Amino acid sequence: MTKLVNEMILVLDFGSQYNQLITRRIREFGVYSELHPHTLTAEEIKKMNPKGIILSGGPNSVYDENSFRCDEKIFELDIPVLGICYGMQLMTHYLGGKVEAASQREYGKANIRIEGTPDLFRDLPNEQVVWMSHGDLVVEVPEGFTVDATSHHCPNSAMSKADKKWYGVQFHPEVRHSEYGNDLLKNFVFGVCECEGEWSMENFIEIEMQKIRETVGDKQVLCALSGGVDSSVVAVLIHKAIGDQLTCIFVDHGLLRKGEAEGVMKTFSEGFNMNVIKVDAKDRFLNKLKGVSDPEQKRKIIGNEFIYVFDDEADKLKGIDYLAQGTLYTDIIESGTATAQTIKSHHNVGGLPEDMQFELIEPLNTLFKDEVRALGTELGIPDEIVWRQPFPGPGLGIRVLGEVTEEKLEIVRESDAILREEIANHGLERDIWQYFTVLPDIRSVGVMGDARTYDYTIGIRAVTSIDGMTSDWARIPWDVLEVISTRIVNEVKHINRVVYDITSKPPATIEWE
């Protein structure tokens, strides 16, 4: 087995929804980082040879009977350890300190004051704003530890035992609301763990190509190609690794955006000289979706049908052992892990049949969306593909709320095309992270000409984001929204009203279903 990286920071997962952000921040520094279950043994960790270990936050109390724990022997490995929030409390509990329930849960921004010149806060201001999210707190640090930071509600906001390179912070440095959080993590990664920062997208390509070759050998791979950013990058990466051992299957399920099916075939079959098989499965998918309105059921149906289509094609091709998918880190987070609650199932991770005939290859499942775009650029994929709007696996099937019909699909397809065209016309396509239209399952009264109408409403969803974990609604200029609204009402049949979604994530998700 090829050695993948020379230096790595290991993050142990105790259930916080922020956990993936820790790995992301560290990779931004040019240091490879992986998230693993808290159940890893000290011996397993030793074999991984990390430069440092981070114990993540989580929803438990260290005194709960079923709270998440880790192997206490990690403190015997002579590897630097940073505990964040619950991770700090668990460290305290294991090493002889005292943790208690706080008299008042602390959630949101807080001011801390640094005591002395601790390693984690080197060259940082003595007072700073951090993001707190905890119900318990450390009331007595373990023997030999010093208190490095205090706040009004949390007198032990940070602690350390410098000679052992053990550190704890009650707040979340990985969240952007902690104004010097990145600097603190850098001090741990570079100052304490002595990493050099050698990891890059170029390095990632080499690593993943080698992993693909070692996994696949001389066997054949099917790639679920949709033409979106994720599947496109997967296809090009795998094709670069194993060439003609890859066959791309493009399923036209009738749930695609306007002009997308034709564009996919031209780009990949002609432009990249890949073996692409187009499967016309419109009727198959729509028949399965007939009468179904529950969003989770729609996702499961579409996910299952995708796999069954690939099964059928694999039978025709013979000798296919692997299926490649563009699953991202955010897909896995939102679908839930052993330690995190499910928000909604994702097409790439939640709808797979138990009797699937092939093994999965998911080379992007440690990357966020913006990292995938950077990877695509490094692979030489054209900007029009790399910067294409994120598009869910179930396609327009989850942008038609309620039952999916041909008429409703055409409404969403045409309105979405108008939105994308006008965003591009006004030079906003790089300023807005994602934008699309949805069709709620409601009608309203309107007046067009001299006649009363009773037709559908189109919702516009446009958000700004960095990684899809959180987002804010995009401030599209009113005059641009006016043009979009006017065009949709006049050019799309059965629409008499347009609304704009001004909800952030959280509390909403980016997609409506």
Curated annotation (Swiss-Prot):
Gene Ontology molecular function terms on file: ATP binding; GMP synthase activity
EC number from the UniProt entry: 6.3.5.2
PROSITE patterns named among the record's database cross-references: GATASE_TYPE_1, GMPS_ATP_PPASE
Catalytic reactions of this protein: XMP + L-glutamine + ATP + H2O = GMP + L-glutamate + AMP + diphosphate + 2 H(+)
CC terms in the record's Gene Ontology section: cytosol
Keyword Metal-binding: no
InterPro entries per the UniProt record, alphabetical: Class_I_gatase-like, GATASE, GMP_synth_C, GMP_synth_GATase, GMP_synthase, GMPS_ATP_PPase_dom, NAD/GMP_synthase, Rossmann-like_a/b/a_fold
Superkingdom field: Bacteria
Keyword terms, alphabetized: ATP-binding, Glutamine amidotransferase, GMP biosynthesis, Ligase, Nucleotide-binding, Purine biosynthesis
Disulfide bonds: none
Sequence ranges assigned to domain GMPS ATP-PPase in this UniProt record: 199-388
Enzyme class of the recorded protein, top EC level: ligase
Binding site for ATP: G227, G228, V229, D230, S231, S232, V233
Residue span(s) of domain Glutamine amidotransferase type-1: 8-198
Pathway the protein takes part in: Purine metabolism; GMP biosynthesis; GMP from XMP (L-Gln route): step 1/1
Active site positions, chain numbering: C85, H172, E174
Gene Ontology BP term (one): GMP biosynthetic process
Biological role stated in the UniProt entry: Catalyzes the synthesis of GMP from XMP.
Assembly with partners or alone: Homodimer.
Name by which UniProt lists this protein: GMP synthase [glutamine-hydrolyzing]
Organism name: Bacillus subtilis (strain 168)
Upper taxonomic lineage: Bacteria, Bacillati, Bacillota, Bacilli, Bacillales
Gene name as annotated: guaA
